[in-house]
Amino acid sequence: MADYLISGGTGYVPEDGLTAQHLFANSDGLTYNDFLILPGFIDFTADEVDLTSALTRKITLKTPLISSPMDTVTESDMAIAMALMGGIGIIHHNCTPEFQANEVRKKFEQGFITDPVVMSLNHTVGDVFEAKNRHGFSGIPVTETGKMGSKLVGIVTSRDIDFLTEKDYSTYLSEVMTKRDELVVAPAGVTLKEANEILQRSKKGKLPIVNDSDELVAIIARTDLKKNRDYPLASKDCRKQLLCGAAIGTREDDKYRLDLLTQAGVDVVVLDSSQGNSVYQINMIHYIKQKYPELQVVGGNVVTAAQAKNLIDAGVDALRVGMGCGSICITQEVMACGRPQGTAVYKVAEYARRFGVPVIADGGIQTVGHVVKALALGASTVMMGSLLAATTEAPGEYFFSDGVRLKKYRGMGSLDAMEKNTSSQKRYFSEGDKVKVAQGVSGSIQDKGSIHKFVPYLIAGIQHGCQDIGAKSLSILRSMMYSGELKLEKRTMSAQVEGGVHGLHSYEKRLY
């Protein structure tokens, strides 16, 4: 009894766990699985946790999630879905500049749509069906010249063409459209709120905005009203358009790609390199900042403070951290360079925060717990590839193998990706090599369903993780880590086994 009845009070609490500074002070490189976060005190519900975090110096996201610029992960469908959920998608550049710019071009989820598809009286029903197949909508305004700024004469909606067949494709729009005198319009200068109220009262699908000369200047869609209601966290720019990023290389011909992307409305460019500490990237940062000073630039990839310093000095607005830690990446194996991701994120974030530069943890994310750990180590956002691959919105077609529904997933350093386009070769400085050295592999991943179901699971998981830690926001989580209040503990291999599913003959692991 005497051994444990030392005091009648509970004022004494022994020191427990390690601060991040102590954990990463030794020479061991740690991954996310090598440590755990010790729980804190809960005095709030999980849904109260604020996940707002900085993507770059000037762009803030309500959800700290980014889809990776890989050709089996992010094109327009993924970027749209990620932005609607409060994150952002980075369109890959393993394609022509024109294709990438078209994927970025903003026509979805806007307040006032100032560049809609417009047709003239000389267009036919077939043209409308072609536009519907290409853009996914059929509410098309008709003007005298078929351009914005021309006199509005009508609109073609799905109700006008629903029951038409191929034999009607040659019919002119003047015969099927809803005429101007039947339309509800709003005057130029109307506020977005007023226009939305008019659209709600009219019960129409589209609301054209016209000037005093009855010329079309913009349009508003009812579907956008519904999206505003259904996606309150959506990432939008000052024009109420969804945020979108794009990756570019660091070579001379990437300057043409950059011009097309800025014309398409890109919000942030990611300089895509496996090793970002190079004269090529520094020169490209200087070029972008001189030509497009307001454009946000993400540099990388880096894993040390020394690498980060050069890019911060060059003027980057955020840093992408990770080298060789992705599930399809073999850089560490082939090149003998890289760093375990836990250590890389902590070391770079601890240095970059002194200059107000946010850090993106890129790679090595296998579970929602890894996301929480990356954020707790100082990352502002987390970039995911394999975790989002094989979702409905990821590029590529599903196929079946042994009865399992799969999608292809490959590293941008794989021979498959490098053979498709030279952009992947430039990322690994190998476009001029006679012999290509693969730094990635190709594989397949089981169908995960839609992003619209998977990302809410990730968001809820992050919130519950922060709740267990006792952090009501991501900014509080980081401040707890840097102040030493957040305590960590290394895990032995036995501890890792214990922390997973064990001791069962068989089991089913359903995450959501």
From Swiss-Prot:
A GO term for molecular function: nucleotide binding
Manganese recorded as keyword: no
Residues given in the record as NAD(+) binding sites: D272, S273, S274, G322, M323, G324
E.C. no: 1.1.1.205
Cross-referenced InterPro entries: Aldolase_TIM, CBS_dom, IMP_DH, IMP_DH/GMP_Rdtase_CS, IMP_DH_GMPRt
Regulation: Mycophenolic acid (MPA) is a non-competitive inhibitor that prevents formation of the closed enzyme conformation by binding to the same site as the amobile flap. In contrast, mizoribine monophosphate (MZP) is a competitive inhibitor that induces the closed conformation. MPA is a potent inhibitor of mammalian IMPDHs but a poor inhibitor of the bacterial enzymes. MZP is a more potent inhibitor of bacterial IMPDH.
Signal peptide: none
Residues bound to IMP: S327, D362, G363, G364, G385, S386, Y409, R410, G411, M412, G413, Q439
Keyword Nucleus tagged: yes
Pathway the protein takes part in: Purine metabolism; XMP biosynthesis via de novo pathway; XMP from IMP: step 1/1
Catalytic activity: IMP + NAD(+) + H2O = XMP + NADH + H(+)
Active site: C329, R427
Binding-site positions, K(+): G324, G326, C329, E498, G499, G500
Cofactor(s) needed by this chain: K(+)
GO cellular component, one term: nucleus
Principal localisation: cytoplasm
Gene Ontology annotations of biological process type: GMP biosynthetic process
Keywords from the UniProt entry: CBS domain, Cytoplasm, GMP biosynthesis, Metal-binding, NAD, Nucleus, Oxidoreductase, Potassium, Purine biosynthesis, Repeat
Family recorded in the similarity comment: Belongs to the IMPDH/GMPR family.
Oligomeric and partner information: Homotetramer.
Function, as annotated: Catalyzes the conversion of inosine 5'-phosphate (IMP) to xanthosine 5'-phosphate (XMP), the first committed and rate-limiting step in the de novo synthesis of guanine nucleotides, and therefore plays an important role in the regulation of cell growth.
Name assigned to this protein: Inosine-5'-monophosphate dehydrogenase 1
Source species taxonomy: Eukaryota, Metazoa, Chordata, Craniata, Vertebrata
